Amino acid sequence: YSVELFASDLASVLDDAGWDTAIIGGASMGGCVALTFANMYAERTVGLGLIDTTAWYGETSIADWEERGQKAITTGMNAMTGFQKTRWFSDNFCAENENIVEHAVEVFVANDPNAYLETCRMLGRCNQSNALRDISVPCEIVVGEEDYATPVAMAESMHQAIVGSNLTVIPKARHLTPLEVPKTIARILLEIDIG
């Protein structure tokens, strides 16, 4: 797996849809792919939405992601759900939206552990830091105030590097803001001004 492979897959989807250009957005891993797409296919990217994501997970990212992926192999996906839920959703959201939380957990545990390991390795290797300065399209960066997976500091770093970008910090939200506050995320993306 590589973010470049996923970005080229996204280009193929746009080709099949008959779209020459699009606003490209993604959350978490999808944000890494969106950023890579904007770098690889700048002429096709008219706007960018980077949600609860980062350009790089830092100096220890390869080891950190390898450890998480290996945990899926040794303990299984179910053993990781408690950790994941606390990163994905605020306590209040969990209490008030049990069906959404349960569905997210079901999707997570349905992952093949070996595929999850390879995805973790991909995220550990991903470093799009140098691509940030080349982003010249309207860009909205969104992060949950309590996002521990890709903290506000990571979003601020991208915001500082992408000239003209906007940064929105969602109060009391964590890592899966598209599920926690979908209307807010939709509004922000719909307001991307592509001229």
Placement of each model-derived feature along the sequence:
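Gly/Ala-rich beta-loop-alpha elbow adjacent to hydrolase catalytic centers
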Residues: 26, 30, 34
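Flexible "cap/lid" loop of the alpha/beta hydrolase fold
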Residues: 35-40, 44-81, 88
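Conserved alpha/beta-hydrolase catalytic His-Asp/Glu region
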Residues: 59-64, 75-134
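Short beta-strand/loop motif that positions the catalytic acidic residue
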Residues: 135, 141-143, 147
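Conserved alpha/beta-hydrolase "acid-adjacent" motif
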Residues: 148-154
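Active-site-adjacent alpha-helix of alpha/beta-hydrolase-fold enzymes
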Residues: 156-165
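Catalytic active-site module of serine/aspartate enzymes centered on a nucleophile-bearing elbow/loop
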Residues: 164-195
